[in-house]
Amino acid sequence: MNRPGNRPSHEQADDYLDKGIALCRRAGFQSILLDGDTDFMQTWKLDAWDRTGYITFVFGADAGKTLVGKAEALPQTAWRRLERPDRYEVRTQERAKPENVKERVVRERGYKNLILQWEDVAEFDHQPHLCQQPYRMVALRKKIAVERGMERLFEEYRYFFYITNDRVGTAEEIVFQSNDRCHQENLIEQLKNGVQAMRNPLDNLHSNWAYMVMSSLAWTLKAWCGLLLPVTPGRWESHHREQRHTILRMEFKRFRNMMLRIPCQIVKTGRRIIYRIMSWNPWTSSLLRLTEAMYYPMRC
């Protein structure tokens, strides 16, 4: 969606979501997930999306008085402690954490500091005003300690809500899935600064739209390289899956340096052409496996 930056992000969001759904269906996708923040919770469309049977949605909901009141009215037994998984796996020896310099400076200068104590999750049914049926509402409760300098002032609860028609996944999975939506912000950043797709170098809307589409093809090709990278069953299966996941999340600058900017000598002999790679990096083997996988035409 290409429009002036002074327009609200959720304007006509339901229309564009419907267009995206139609496009995915034409492409053959059997199930579709809609994931967005509070501004994209189009309550007048939830019933229609739910009736399709193939659309699952997870939207953030504003922590208004009604939802906060329902969450506070839940019995304590309805809440479960949320344990977040580690961001990465330590493969060698775990090292001691370095000093949090920012935390120390905040305390020394007497600034207000918010410290997360723990997180709890619960769920209940909630029917928005414009809906004809209730939906599953997952509540995330964070206990925050408010400090100023070396003194603790008070503790408070902050609530976050997620509305969904997914009745299968656990409340923890719904929260993690919604938090993973933040990767989309990284995608926008890469489209802007990685492949320079949002620079708007021309003087009219249609030309800038065409430039954006053509420039974003570079990022699309990177994504397809990650998706098409073969995974060999057996000893190297987990390593190959990790490589695929890394390429999908890799910044475009790193992808360009690791898999595109490779010095290569081209030798023409008889009836064949030989490509001799003149240097090696940790991703050279992945490039060769990808080349072998793409050598033959893909069949549907």
At which residue positions do the language-model features occur?
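Short, surface-exposed basic-aromatic patches at helix termini and helix-loop junctions that form
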Residues: 26, 46-55
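Short amphipathic alpha-helical "interface-anchor" segments enriched in bulky aromatics
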Residues: 171-205, 210, 214, 218-222
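Short, conserved catalytic/metal-binding motifs centered on acidic residues
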Residues: 32-41, 57, 162, 184-191, ...
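Active-site beta-loop-alpha junctions enriched in small/polar residues
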Residues: 4, 37-41, 62-64
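An anionic, glycine-rich sequence signature occurring as long contiguous blocks
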Residues: 58-187, 193, 292, 296-300
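Short acidic, glycine/serine/threonine-rich loops at helix termini
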Residues: 1, 11, 43-49, 68-74
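A short, flexible helix-boundary coil/loop motif
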Residues: 222-300
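Electropositive, glycine- and tryptophan-enriched low-complexity nucleic-acid-binding patches
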Residues: 1-27, 31
